[in-house]
């Protein structure tokens, strides 16, 4: 029989840190929920709970409206750490 894969249990970083509110101006906190092309990462990849995932999505969308985070990145200019561009 095939060996079963052992998965590491993902946990919510926000629940562990006991964060009550996610501010859209805190781009350092939001970068953990964005991919290298500035897409919002799903819960199954980040391990974020439903409550905090909704708060993160709302904060990211507000940060995009305020031009703190770009909507998209050109395919040719994808960087390893996208927050190096933001300063």
Swiss-Prot record:
Coiled coil: none annotated. The keyword Phosphoprotein does not apply. One of its GO terms (molecular function) is structural constituent of ribosome. Keywords: Ribonucleoprotein, Ribosomal protein, RNA-binding, rRNA-binding. GO terms for cellular component: cytosolic small ribosomal subunit. Binds as a heterodimer with protein bS6 to the central domain of the 16S rRNA, where it helps stabilize the platform of the 30S subunit. Part of the 30S ribosomal subunit. Forms a tight heterodimer with protein bS6. This is Small ribosomal subunit protein bS18. It comes from Campylobacter hominis (strain ATCC BAA-381 / DSM 21671 / CCUG 45161 / LMG 19568 / NCTC 13146 / CH001A).
């Amino acid at each position: 029989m095939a060996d079963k894969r052992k998965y590491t249990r993902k946990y919510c970083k926000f629940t562990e840190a006991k964060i009550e509110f996610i501010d859209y101006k805190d781009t350092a906190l939001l970068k953990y929920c964005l991919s290298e092309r500035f897409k919002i990462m799903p819960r199954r990849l980040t391990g974020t709970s439903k409550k905090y995932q909704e708060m993160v999505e709302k904060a990211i969308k507000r940060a995009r409206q305020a031009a703190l985070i770009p909507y998209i990145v050109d395919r040719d200019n994808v960087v390893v750490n996208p927050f190096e561009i933001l300063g």
